[in-house]
A protein has these predicted regions:
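Histidine-centered active-site/metal-ligand motif
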Residues: 194-195, 395, 462, 550
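A residue-level signal for conserved active-site and pocket-lining positions in enzyme catalytic cores
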Residues: 60, 167, 322, 518, ...
Length: 618
């Protein structure tokens, strides 16, 4: 049984009471202890058998870790956790075809997606090919004008440029028409992907995708870069078998490329379990060596002076690489990650940093307008299960970010649409929309149903995120369909919303030893959430607004011990109002702990997720 399955089973065996009696927090959550009653004996057994502190045992057990799995969770290694790449369907065919390309010195084109996973996957393949003397042509489609995945014109261009082999990464599984163009023109294609697949697959040389329906590898949780890494491992093995190495021909330094795999794994928000934990743990270690010239330049451009963490990957480096695909040149990120020229890398890194600042400005302006419109919609119908709003002044590349913010703020699925400007004033034209959801509402399923019903030009996605294209003339019909499709799920999900708590603590117990202990169970991210602690009945001794949207506080316990904390984007929200309006009365405050370095001094602070007034709980 998998870790998530074990956790679900443990939770279902016994109903839990609200943690500290919090039934309705500032953000509208019921607080629950993450460690289910059925997991408490497992936590104790983990602690005793492996000789680790009880707190660490509780953190591990609460995340579904079994007693025998602890060593591989605390010290994940590629050797122990990566299976033979041949377990993936079509892997041996792909490896042989890549080896052929190397030995024949063929021209190879790499066609990637415009997000971080696509950029990292493209760079991985290009660096591997480059080691073997092949300078790959990287093609990243323009998000606005070409959209996701291969298109016939792009494929035809690559073939005309002389590509003897095209490798698609993080895309291609459902690109039937474009890839048929390659076959018609006599060029082989290898698809390396991780997106959900139909039973029918493109007619190409190989489709390496753990989420194709006939694949039984159990590796569906990998991102595209994770699959790409396994592919170059297999291709290296095939070349070794053919005797390609030796006599001065060295094997590629595969492990030194894991920094790219780690970056993609975190940014694509795939579960940090199993092999993904090894990818990220080892990849962060590689990144600390600053060997990748492009990543080093990006880290310097961002002004980072601390060792990289999963937070660094997801919230500092990832957005900068994505900025090129959102509002600039989509290929900038992939190019940066392949550079060997420090001057050129520094130039592109600065350009991406500038684009990221521009993206933030665009997002802020769009979000302000979207929040105002959404507030009116929710005030008119508090039970509205899905927010759908759009404008012809909004940027296609940023609608997904705004949708995420709306979903976070209003705790319901949202769809943000950027309408084309047709200049006619007739109300005609198409819009490109991005949807984000909450746990318990499968928004991808709803979008696919709307597309099947003929209400959308196209649409698809997965449970938590989806995309669509819709004619303005069909918007109201599509809106009504989608709202009714998610109404039941959204209502149930919002009423059952919980915030999971790992334990209670006071500032006196927060020290380096505790943080070191918590870090042992990392890296944290999707599928392995950062431990969240409650500081119960603490007084807010100091509070101020920071910038335009954040609240900084100092919490004090009954023993006079203190800790600083910050609540991001809390101004104008119930959380900010709670923190700023305690009137000297004690409140419960929940959040995660993080080391912070400022001015040469290191301290531990609380990243505040939620708060609750004990007097308002039943």
């Amino acid at each position: 049984m998998s870790a998530p399955a074990r956790r679900k089973a443990a939770i279902s065996t016994e109903e839990q009471a609200a943690y500290l009696g919090v039934e309705n927090s500032a953000r509208g959550f019921q607080w629950r202890e993450r460690l289910a009653p059925g997991q408490r004996n497992i936590a104790l057994a983990i602690s005793q058998r492996h000789g680790i502190p009880e707190l660490l045992g509780r953190v591990l057990a609460a995340r579904g870790v079994g007693i025998d799995e602890v060593p591989l969770v605390l010290e994940p290694t590629i050797k122990a956790l990566m299976p033979d790449p041949s377990v993936l369907q079509d892997m041996d065919v792909a490896a042989a075809r890549l080896a052929d390309a190397v030995q024949k010195h063929q021209n190879v084109a790499v066609f990637g997606d415009y997000d971080v996973d696509g950029a990292c996957s493209s760079a991985l393949m290009a660096r591997w090919l480059g080691h073997h003397g092949i300078r790959a042509r990287i093609y990243i489609p323009d998000r606005i004008f070409e959209g996701y995945g291969p298109n016939p014109a792009a494929i035809e261009t690559l073939v005309k440029e002389g590509a003897g082999l095209i490798v698609t990464v993080d895309c291609g599984t459902t690109s039937f028409e474009p890839l048929a163009v390659a076959r018609k023109l006599g060029t082989d294609v290898i698809v390396i992907d991780h997106h959900q697949a139909d039973e029918k697959l493109p007619d190409v040389a190989a489709v390496v995708n753990p989420n194709r329906q006939d694949d039984i590898s159990g590796l569906g949780h990998l991102c595209a870069a994770g699959v790409t890494f396994m592919t170059i491992v297999a291709a290296t093995r095939e070349l070794r078998r053919r005797g390609a190495y030796g006599n001065g021909a060295a094997e590629p330094p595969l492990l030194s490329m894991l920094d790219l795999v780690a970056l993609a794994t975190v940014c694509d928000v795939v579960p940090l379990q199993g092999l993904n934990r090894a990818y990220v743990t080892r990849g962060l270690a590689v990144m600390r060596q600053r060997e990748n010239i492009g990543l080093r330049a990006l880290i310097d451009a961002a002004g980072l002076n601390q060792p990289p963490t999963t937070y660094t990957l997801g919230f500092v480096l990832g957005p900068r690489i994505n900025a090129g695909g959102r509002i600039g040149d989509a290929a900038l990120g992939a190019r940066l990650l392949t550079f060997e020229d420090e001057t050129e890398a520094a130039r592109i890194a600065v350009q991406l940093d500038k684009l990221n600042r521009e993206r933030k400005s665009i997002e802020t302006e769009m979000l302000s307008a979207a929040l105002a419109e959404a507030e009116v919609m929710v005030d008119a119908d508090p039970a509205l299960p899905l927010l759908i709003l759009g404008s012809d002044t909004w940027h296609k590349g940023v609608v997904g970010l705004v949708s995420s913010r709306l979903t976070e703020r209003f705790r319901r699925p949202s769809c943000v649409i950027a309408w084309e400007k047709d200049g006619s004033g007739s109300g005609k034209g198409q819009g490109t929309g991005s949807l984000r959801s909450i746990t318990g509402v499968d928004i991808g399923k709803a979008v696919r149903a709307a597309a099947t019903a003929g209400l959308l030009v196209k649409g698809g996605g997965h449970a938590m995120a989806a995309g669509l294209t819709v004619e303005k003339s069909r918007l109201e019909a599509a809106r009504a369909f989608l709202i009714e499709n998610v109404r039941a799920e959204a209502g149930a999900a919002r009423s059952a919303a919980t915030l999971e708590i790992d334990g209670a603590i006071t500032p006196a117990g927060v020290n380096d030893k505790l943080i070191n202990l918590i870090e042992q169970a990392g890296p944290y991210g999707q599928g392995n959430p950062q431990p969240r602690f409650v500081f119960p009945a603490h007084r807010v001794k100091f509070a101020k607004v920071m910038g335009e949207a954040h609240v900084r506080v100092t919490l004090e316990a009954g023993d006079a011990s203190k800790i600083d904390g910050i609540a991001f984007r809390a101004i104008g929200q119930p959380l900010g109002e709670t923190l700023l309006g305690t009137g000297g009365m004690p409140i419960h405050v929940a959040g995660t702990l993080r080391r912070d370095s400022w001015g040469g001094r290191e301290k531990i602070e609380l990243m505040i997720d939620d708060a609750a007034d004990p007097r308002k709980q039943s």
